[in-house]
Amino acid sequence: MRRGGAARGEPPFAVCCAPPLCNNLVAVPAAIIMMMRSLLRFPLVAFPFLLPTQSAWAADISAANTAWMLTATALVLFMTLPGLSLFYGGLVRVRNVLSVLMQCFALTALMSLLWFVAGYSLAFGSSGVEQGPWLGDLGNLFLAAVSMEGNSGDIPESLFVMFQMTFAVITPALIVGGFAERIRFSAMLVFSAAWMLLVYAPVCHWVWGGGWLGSMGLQDFAGGTVVHITAAVAALVAALMLGPRRGFGSVAMPPHNLTMTVTGAGMLWVGWFGFNAGSAVAADGSAAMAMLVTHLSAACGSLAWMTMEWIRHGKPSVLGIVTGMVAGLGTITPASGSVGPAAAVVIGLSAGVICYYATLTLKNRLKIDDSLDVFPVHGVGGILGTLLAGVFCSPNLGIFSGNGFSEGISSIGGQLAVQAT
């Protein structure tokens, strides 16, 4: 072998290795190939250690439902960050934008921690333990009983915890709109923490955790009572106790950036599919129908509010069209698992009209400074949707028929009585 390359006729690798080593390098791959051919002659069951194992826990888990619920959970969190943050941030005056954004961000972090500490246990208790009518048991403080192997139905329990956590995050964030521009950051954190543990978690248990309202047959598929009514009432009470902003009623307080608001509204619309359709806790027809009726109600609420403004002021506004959308979404929330498409159109149109007049009444007649219209949109919408769920769940309304009454109830009157409770 000469310096600078192989001699003519020599193989190229002769420049880098001696012939004995080269023979070994060629022989090793050949031996591996022969061994693999020998293994393939035997059935795989002869080597059980090569077969994938499946635990009893894994057999109880639906991959399809788990995948959908992972997606829905991300969508609901997306509603708060950045959806609701941008929606609210664009509605306030420019000097308060960062304050509102920070409040929504901080609430996401704080509510997540509180849900881990005690919120989930108060709302849902421990698996396999009979729950009381008012509160869940305390066996899941710090999520002590939640493990990787645990399941809730046919999805991992950890995923159910996370999905419900996103609801606990966005509900206090909705209240921010009631006292925006006039509360100290520290006071907001203390109030929100106490409210989540003392109001949200118990009501969540009453409806979804085996409590007294759920046992009565209340139909609240995705949170008309648990989320919208509770948050709206809290926002209204806070607005009354804090009093109006300086200059309210005499100084114009227009939104500072409607582009930001419209962007946030679009995110809310998309995220709401996870909110409502995810509440089916399965990738099935119930989730698909919930998504369809949610979209129809949002569209009809938006058009109805726009039309009311057009009639009253001679032209529609971009703020009106997005607020009507939110009204339609909030109103269909309790009914999204109970009604069909035709009923969803009626619910959306009703939401746009009724919530529009509720907003005018609260601000212009009652002179209540609910900064970002939380009560007339979410509160009135949540109440309206809860009542209409009791009507349109009936299976005897032709094209407007729904999925039926709750167990033990056989008439619209009986279901309405429960819904009104």
Residue ranges and their predicted role:
Residues 2-3, 8, 37, 41:
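Basic polycationic patches enriched in arginine
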Residues 16-17, 22:
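Cysteine-centered motifs
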Residues 22-58:
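N-terminal secretory/membrane targeting signals
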Residues 57-421:
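Glycine- and aromatic-enriched membrane alpha-helices
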Residues 5-6, 16, 29-30, 234, ...:
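A ubiquitous, low-specificity "background" feature that marks scattered single residues
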Residues 11:
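Cationic, low-complexity basic patches in intrinsically disordered or flexible, solvent-exposed regions
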Residues 2, 15-16, 156:
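Short N-terminal alpha-helical targeting/association segments
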Residues 5-6, 52, 324:
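Intrinsically disordered/low-complexity terminal segments and short unstructured peptides
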